Amino acid sequence: MSAELIAVYKDEQIIDLESAKVLGLSDGVKALKGSEPIYFDDSPLALEVIRHSCAHLLAQSLKALYPDAKFFVGPVVEEGFYYDFKTASKISEEDLPKIEAKMKEFAKSKLAITKEVLTKEQALERFKGDELKHAVMSKISGDAFGVYQQGGFEDLCKGPHLPNTRFLNHFKLTKLAGAYLGGDEKNEMLIRIYGIAFATKEGLKDYLFQIEEAKKRDHRKLGVELGLFSFDDEIGAGLPLWLPKGARLRKRIEDLLSKALLLRGYEPVKGPEILKSDVWKISGHYDNYKENMYFTTIDEQEYGIKPMNCVGHIKVYQSALHSYRDLPLRFYEYGVVHRHEKSGVLHGLLRVREFTQDDAHIFCSFEQIQSEVSAILDFTHKIMKAFDFSYEMELSTRPAKSIGDDKVWEKATNALKEALKEHHINYKIDEGGGAFYGPKIDIKITDALKRKWQCGTIQVDMNLPERFKLAFTNEHNNAEQPVMIHRAILGSFERFIAILSEHFWGNFPFFVAPTQIVLIPINEEHHVFALKLKEELKKRDIFVEVLDKNDSLNKKVRLAEKQKIPMILVLGNEEMETEILSIRDREKQAQYKMPLKEFLNMVESKMQEVSF
């Protein structure tokens, strides 16, 4: 079965066997010249077809078990697929095995999956009385509506799909959740069931193993266990509280970045948290981003709490006149921003309403875009290497709706391509995926579980400089508009620390660990020695704690190990008298002895090992 053709890829779309027949091609997909074959396997394009068909298999099974069920949409998403539906029956996680069993029953029945195309009038009549399908149709333009059928079940869908349910043998329903109709909180709440599907048994097995590993590494769980952060309902959803250890971790990353930024010619700036709505109207945020912003009124003047830092940095630029000799100007800020995220999408530190970006804006000439982006790519590589992340880049090009002329866009896009080429970076191209005001590069990191995360962005902006009428005096003494480059490498400290926590499973490397060394005095008489050593380590900028609880030595050591502290030092008579320390080193997975002075020199050196 692995060699069977299930669809083709042509003109950036997947065309399944049934769609080829509907197009009137008697030989099916074979008649589609210049197309790329898609075989039944675990490749990305094949999985899109497989998972889409598995979503329909889920809907068919739900209809069989709950005849009153009505269905909204069932798309393929990054984590598999889901279907939104409603029924008068109460459905819980405990019902998933029963639904899954029904899916397997239909899969074994080897039902042919067929397609027909209806006019809008025919589709409205076919799904008469189904308000959810009518809601779907209201969002579709044109007069061609695809309907896929299998074993008496049919659903409105554009595809692509497998030719038969016999292909669907390796799937799993993963969770049940609620979802508002169309993602709008004003609409009714539907039931959403998620699932995953693969062509092979190995693919499903590996994925389920990864899911279990991800549960163990969940940063929300680690945040509590390691005392990094918390949330409080009395404060509000999506508003994290950084506890001392989490704040230390974050500060260490901030300090390392600041040192590197200053060496790379960035200047620290700081903008206000609230700005008059007038500037948000100039920037376009008021018209295009208002629903994601918070507003307040002071002295009858409306203010917007900033969702982004760019406007503040523009005003810093405008605070003085600039010549071409001043450029590039690089401003950075650890900017706190607020965005109104719907409660249903909030997720630990990964999705919050208040977060801090490692934000920077570079004001430069067109000719400087390539060199500035090249420097950012170099910076990115050093940061990712320090944290043991592999990463990939994606270049997004001009969308259909955009500002600026073709030559300007081509020049800006080529500058990004040349910068990527200079660093020998293989990158994907998202044709038409850029913002309306300029091309961009997205930075996607891969963690220890092979999960990909969108973090940083390098965005060329030709819109805001025009809106705010930014200028510099060029070498011919004429006013010229600068280009603005938005740049965040981590994205936000909250999101990056969540990813970092799961990547290392809380075993943070020494240079950023929230507690780097713990000192365990065996008895009270060793406590003074521990405090003196603590002071020596603090002078060397080491985060150190003395564990002097009234517990047994073994219990204190186990507690320190559970806290995933890189180095544990047990201090007794021998260590105090000889000043030769006993060290338990987590990173080396070893125990060894070292003279005090040598140890102090070693940890001092370890703090210098990493730089960006």
UniProtKB/Swiss-Prot annotation:
Superkingdom, taxonomy of origin: Bacteria
Keywords annotated in UniProt: Aminoacyl-tRNA synthetase, ATP-binding, Cytoplasm, Ligase, Metal-binding, Nucleotide-binding, Protein biosynthesis, RNA-binding, tRNA-binding, Zinc
Cofactor, free-text remark: Binds 1 zinc ion per subunit.
EC code(s) of this entry: 6.1.1.3
Cofactor(s) essential for the protein: Zn(2+)
Stored HAMAP family: Thr_tRNA_synth
Protein name: Threonine--tRNA ligase
Organism: Helicobacter acinonychis (strain Sheeba)
